[in-house]
Design a protein with these regions (language model features):
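Short, flexible domain-boundary/linker segments around small modular repeats
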Residues: 93-134, 190, 194-217
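Bacterial N-terminal signal peptides that target proteins for export
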Residues: 1-8
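Solvent-exposed N-terminal domain segments of exported/luminal and surface proteins
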Residues: 20-124
Length: 217
């Protein structure tokens, strides 16, 4: 489970493509900001890209993620961010996809958000060419994570895996943290129709205090 606070401050991502190489990550303090600078190369082997479900080739990047050194909570929740965090190795965390249900689109999806039903990356991860670390490559060659790969991280409590845009730490704690987002029951009342299966983000609803985490976790 990815754990992050509700209030998103800001997240600068400066990117330019360069040649592939070894992992590089540096942390710098710039005034009131902490910046994680990386070349976009993970600290582990990645899957084969391109592959049958992902036509994109991996490319080394120049990434600069900056966030408040001292995070502050506010009363406002910010929605709609694609990048919700950066790993401690300097790789973006992007749980969402850019694909929506579209009866006229290829394989029933397109980048047109008109339907309001956004595809969940981890419902059928291999359909997006996601590798064993739950990451893949976008059109720019940027490798990013869609989820924590529980089989690839140490199984201990309160494992720091990264930082959110507001500066709060992101922990992986599967034994203590439980989500308050639940799969809806019944069937969808609008296209795409069918049972709530978890294929789309909108298949889930937030149920207050049904788990230990709030709506932003």
């Amino acid at each position: 489970m990815i754990k992050f606070k509700c209030t998103i401050y800001f997240f600068f991502i400066l990117t330019a493509i360069s040649n592939a190489g070894e992992n590089f990550r540096n942390i710098e303090i710039k005034g009131k900001l902490t910046c994680i600078i990386s070349n976009g190369v993970p600290s582990h082997d990645i899957g084969r890209f391109p592959n049958s479900a992902n036509p994109n080739s991996f490319k080394k990047q120049k990434l600069n993620f900056c966030f408040p050194t001292i995070p502050q909570l506010t009363e406002k929740v910010t929605w709609g961010l694609m990048t919700v965090g950066v790993s401690i190795s300097g790789i973006p965390i992007r749980p969402y996809t850019a694909e929506y249900f579209d009866s006229n689109g290829k394989r029933g999806y397109s980048r047109n958000p008109a339907s309001g039903w956004r595809k969940q990356a981890m419902y059928l991860p291999r359909s997006l060419g996601i590798d064993q670390h739950n990451g893949h490559v976008d059109k720019s060659g940027l490798y990013h994570y869609h989820s924590v790969s529980k089989n690839k991280v140490p199984q201990r409590s309160d494992l720091l895996i990264g930082y959110a845009p507001d500066g709060f730490k992101i922990f992986y704690n599967p034994n203590k943290a439980t989500s308050s987002w639940r799969l809806r029951s019944g069937t969808r009342t609008a296209p795409p129709g069918g049972f709530y299966s978890g294929e789309f983000e909108q298949d889930f609803e937030y149920r207050v205090q049904s788990g230990s985490l709030d709506e932003c976790n």
